[in-house]
Amino acid sequence: MLIIILLLIASYLLGAIPFGLWIGKIFFKKNLHDYGSGNTGTTNTFRILGVKAGIAVFIFDLLKGTLATLLPLIFHINGVSPLIFGLLAVIGHTLSIFDHFKGGKAVATSAGVVLGFSPFFLLYLLVIFILVLWLFSMISLSSVVAAIFALLGILIFPSFGFILTSYDLLFSIIIFALAIIIIFRHKTNLKRIKNHCESLVPFGLNLSRQKEK
């Protein structure tokens, strides 16, 4: 029981590591909270610190979720779903004890959790993400739409045995929780999208005709 508690705490602490914030401060002498959206996640890192830093933060944030999800397997723990460990990593990422309980928007770390538990489901979401990104040129919208399609996937796919072969109540609950976290963390982005002033990536069709301020 003690090892389970320690690993649950470790999952939160692992997720709480603010790689974007630390990389910005150590290597670029910049506090991401003072630039762009003020967020310490992958997207703001790309915009403020550049491609190399953005890729590094994305990989680290993704692996936080994956490693936390795999902790029960690594330590041969039974009786507690790996998804619980993954969810704690996402909570750590969004409410980091190392960053005054601030954090990212949970997309990369949530993707890492899904990667550790159901890689093909993540692949399905990645296709949705890339398609929406190309059509609308917005990472925020792509993230929210992928979260919505994750909810649709857990409802529909088990009926056809496609990707998800059967209904898994806990997986459905965790996916629901992750989707809600992602959508909630993007509420300011959704307001900007509504006002046609959301930040864009430098490619894609920008079908909604956003104009960055």
UniProtKB/Swiss-Prot annotation:
Q: Does the keyword Zinc-finger apply?
A: no
Where in or outside the cell it occurs: the entry states: Cell membrane
Cite the annotated pathway.
Lipid metabolism; phospholipid metabolism
User: What is one cellular component GO term in this UniProt entry?
Assistant: plasma membrane
Q: Which reaction does it catalyse?
A: an acyl phosphate + sn-glycerol 3-phosphate = a 1-acyl-sn-glycero-3-phosphate + phosphate
Keywords assigned by UniProt?
Answer: Cell membrane, Lipid biosynthesis, Lipid metabolism, Membrane, Phospholipid biosynthesis, Phospholipid metabolism, Transferase, Transmembrane, Transmembrane helix
Q: Does the keyword Signal apply?
A: no
* GO MF annotations, alphabetized: acyl-phosphate glycerol-3-phosphate acyltransferase activity
Residue ranges spanning the membrane: these are 3-23, 48-68, 71-91, 119-139, 144-164, 165-185
Q: What is its EC number?
A: 2.3.1.275
Q: What class of enzyme is it?
A: transferase
GO terms classed as biological process? phospholipid biosynthetic process
Q: What is its main location?
A: membrane
InterPro entries in alphabetical order: G3P_acylTferase_PlsY
How is it placed in the membrane, per its record? Multi-pass membrane protein
Functional summary from the UniProt entry: Catalyzes the transfer of an acyl group from acyl-phosphate (acyl-PO(4)) to glycerol-3-phosphate (G3P) to form lysophosphatidic acid (LPA). This enzyme utilizes acyl-phosphate as fatty acyl donor, but not acyl-CoA or acyl-ACP.
Membership in a protein family? Belongs to the PlsY family.
State whether it acts alone or in a complex, and with which partners, per the record.
Probably interacts with PlsX.
**Name this protein carries in UniProt:** Glycerol-3-phosphate acyltransferase
